[in-house]
Every structure is written in structure tokens, then in C-alpha cells.
Amino acid sequence: MALYLVIRLRGQPDRRPEEEKALELLRLHKVYHAVLVKDDPSIKGMLERTLSSAVTWGEINKETLVELLKRRGRITGNKRLTEEYLKKIGFNSFEELAEALISGKVSLEDLPGVKPVFRLRPPSGGFRGTIRRNINARGELGYRGADINNLVLRML
């Protein structure tokens, strides 16, 4: 079972109501916010049909997920996600948590106090294409597969 990372790249103006609702359901309220979602047919359909003009997504690997959790993971009170806190909720390390997330044993919503949204920065070096077009048309939007890992590492 794959775990997708979804990043919002485009802002609020001129969004259709169904796009706004889908972004709200995914908790992508601001540009450069990211969430982890399961590989589910309903989520996949929502991404492909409704949100392909506002977000980019792909399968995240374990190494990138560990870095994302270490550097951008937050708990209640806007404090960093630390190894001490992970031990309190039953995980010995970031690697163990990442493995549990990817295998589908646990989700971020199930963990007490862990915020499910990651606030990223704009990518260092900028985007390779425009954020107005799809990835297939020399843009940045839409499904990018494993290339999402390179983008996320530049946004941490």
C-alpha cells in the first residue's frame, strides 16, 4: 500500500467550489502545505479529477518521510516532533514511525498531539517549470510519482 504526499502549489483565487471543498477536506489551507494520504481510490479520484490544477502528489519513500518528520513534524503548541515525544506515544525512532506510516499500520491522525499538516518552504533553486501547467506539459502540477521526493527535500 502506497503513501502519497500531497503538496498545495496554487493559492485561493478563482478556485471552483468543489476544489475549495476538496482542499479543505485534505487540510491544505495554504500554499506549500503538505499532507500524507493513503492510496485509496476515492482520494486518487479526488486528486486526479478535482485537484490536479492546484496540487502535486506522488509516492513518498521512507528516507524522505524520516527527514520530513524530523525537520517539519510538529506537535500541539507548535513544538517540534522529537524522539522523546515519539517514545511517549510508543515509537522508538523516526524510522520506526515512518515504517508504520508507509505500511499503513498507523496514520498521523491516530497519533495524539501530532499535527497532520507539514508547513514547507518554497523549493530552493525554484521550480523547474511553471506552477500553472501540468507536469507533463513542462509544469509542476499533478501526479509526479517518486519525483516528489526530490521536490520535498528541496522544500524542507
From Swiss-Prot:
Keywords: Ribonucleoprotein, Ribosomal protein
CDD domains named in the record: Ribosomal_L7_archeal_euk
Protein family (similarity comment): Belongs to the universal ribosomal protein uL30 family.
PANTHER family given in the database record: 60S RIBOSOMAL PROTEIN L7 (PTHR11524), LARGE RIBOSOMAL SUBUNIT PROTEIN UL30 (PTHR11524:SF16)
Gene Ontology cellular component annotations, sorted alphabetically: cytosolic large ribosomal subunit
InterPro entries in the record: Ribo_uL30_ferredoxin-like_sf, Ribosomal_uL30, Ribosomal_uL30_arc, Ribosomal_uL30_euk_arc, Ribosomal_uL30_ferredoxin-like
Transmembrane domains' residue ranges: none
GO molecular function terms attached to this record: RNA binding; structural constituent of ribosome
BP-aspect Gene Ontology terms: maturation of LSU-rRNA from tricistronic rRNA transcript (SSU-rRNA, 5.8S rRNA, LSU-rRNA); translation
SUPFAM superfamilies linked: Ribosomal protein L30p/L7e
Record's protein name: Large ribosomal subunit protein uL30
Keyword Transmembrane helix: no
Organism from which the protein derives: Thermofilum pendens (strain DSM 2475 / Hrk 5)
Assembly and oligomerization: Part of the 50S ribosomal subunit.
Highest rank taxon of the organism: Archaea
NCBIfam families with a match to the protein in the record: PRK06049.1, uL30_arch
